[in-house]
Amino acid sequence: MSTAKLDDSTQRPLYGERIIKESKIICFENPNKKRIYEISIDLPEFTCKCPFSGYPDFAKLNIIYQPNLRVYELKSLKLYINNFRDIKISHEEVVNRIMDDLLSAGSPHWIHLNASFNPRGNVSMQLDIFSGQKKN
């Protein structure tokens, strides 16, 4: 192993880590408020840590929603989701926290959040949360 002294730039948080840590869900104006339509977003690389073992948990998140006045901006959503990768949190708590933040940021007519956690120890878990009234 090298004993070379690290320069200051390698000891500070990297710019990507800073951006992820400071991220919030951003929305923009719905371009067609008069039309009812659904948006589906897949986030296949979600990670957080088990609060009991510290082992990583992996999941695929799927968000389906009918926007009201605002639409979720995808890059900010990706960065927000990446912020959970080092947080020790249960499946139930993290999915409810994400739903709360989605509702707070976008106030959709209707939203469904599905989290499909990869098997660990021969057990997989799927969580579904709904909010609002779906319009036809």
Swiss-Prot record:
Subcellular location: Cytoplasm
Active site positions: C50 (thioimide intermediate), D57 (proton donor)
SUPFAM superfamilies (alphabetical): Tetrahydrobiopterin biosynthesis enzymes-like (SSF55620)
Record-level GO BP terms: queuosine biosynthetic process; tRNA modification
This protein's UniProt keywords: Cytoplasm, NADP, Oxidoreductase, Queuosine biosynthesis
Catalysed conversion reaction: 7-aminomethyl-7-carbaguanine + 2 NADP(+) = 7-cyano-7-deazaguanine + 2 NADPH + 3 H(+)
Domain of life: Bacteria
EC assignment: 1.7.1.13
Broad enzyme group: oxidoreductase
Chief location category: cytoplasm
Cellular component per GO, a single term: cytoplasm
Listed GO MF terms: preQ1 synthase activity
HAMAP family, per database record: QueF_type1
The protein's role, per its UniProt record: Catalyzes the NADPH-dependent reduction of 7-cyano-7-deazaguanine (preQ0) to 7-aminomethyl-7-deazaguanine (preQ1).
Similarity comment: Belongs to the GTP cyclohydrolase I family. QueF type 1 subfamily.
Name of the protein in its database record: NADPH-dependent 7-cyano-7-deazaguanine reductase
Annotated source species: Prochlorococcus marinus (strain MIT 9215)
